Structures are given as structure tokens and as C-alpha cells.
Amino acid sequence: TDILAHLRDWQICASIDGTGAVGEYIRTGLKWEQFLQNYKDAQAIQTNDRLMRLDFTLTLPGLFEVENMFWLSKELNTQILAKVTFAFSPDIVMSPLSLPRHILEPYVSSVLERIKPHADKHQQPLVDVLEQLLNRPTLEEQWPDEYADGMRRGKERILTLESIRTQPITMAEILKQNLEIYEWWNRIEVKN
């Protein structure tokens, strides 16, 4: 903020994938409390509310952060931009589209029921992305013949990364927040 205060024109889109430990899991190196304080410090010197935005990338573990991000946007009175993790092959298990339709749709719909009535112009982009997600083809629908093998490879990649990283939580622990999603994750068989 010591530099920003002396600039005439500036803008920050803070790329963030979640709050707290889940945000730190998704984006290695994030220190949530420090990020939040830095964001608030910069907000204190902004001259209008379009100078700072939260840029939220929706991931599979980030599904459990949608409501936290929504309410953070309200608390900070800041716009949240939103997009979904690219899903360009059937092994992108970090995409929420890796979930089968019968699991994805009710989960996203229930989140929308809770947040949509409270949305204003700052949260509407997040609501829009969630509504669009319901109409996008899942990985299983896009690659029916390759889906099972893709999920196996994607899960193996996640487990390999988790064995290297030093984070206190795992994908499985995050997904435990929803029994159906957790059971789906556990059914993905990996090679030993």
C-alpha cells in the first residue's frame, strides 16, 4: 500500500480460489490471513470500488468455498469475478465438472438456493457462473469412454502432489464435507 498510495491509476484483480486452509490447499504458497489483511489494507486507499476485485477460480475443492467467497465479497463490499477451472481432457479432477451430473447438479443447486437471494451486483458474476455450470457438459458426458481412466489418472496426480506438499489437509478431507462427493472420490480406484 505504501507504493499504491502514490499511483494515480491502479487496479488489482486478486486471484484467489478459496478461503482459509482450503484456499491454501488449492493455491500452494497462499497465506490466507496475510492475503486478507493485504487486501483490506489496499481497500483502505482505493478511491472507488472498481479498483479491487476478487478473481475466484472455481475448482472441485473450491465448490466448498463458494459460500465463503460469496460472503467475503459481501463483507468487503468488493466484486467477485468468477470462472471455472478449464476441463480440456478427462483427467482434470480439479475441475468441478469432474463430478458426475447426478452429484454436481444437486450440490450446485443447493448452494445457489442459499446465496442467490442475497446477491447484489458484486456477487452476481459468481451466481452467473454457478448457473452456467449447471448447463455445461461434465467430463463424464464429454468423454464417456475415457472418463473412468481419466479420473484415475487425475486422482493419482493429486495424490502424488499431496505426498510432496506439506499442507495439513488433503483433497479427501476437503471432500468429506459432502458425503456423496466424498464417496465418489473414494470409488475412484488408483493403481498401486
Residue ranges: model-predicted function:
Residues 3, 40, 103, 107, ...:
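Intrinsically disordered, low-complexity regions enriched in Ser/Pro/Gly/Gln/His and often acidic
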Residues 58-63, 81-113, 123, 127-140, ...:
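Flexible glycine/acidic-rich beta-alpha junction loops that bind and position SAM and/or redox cofactors
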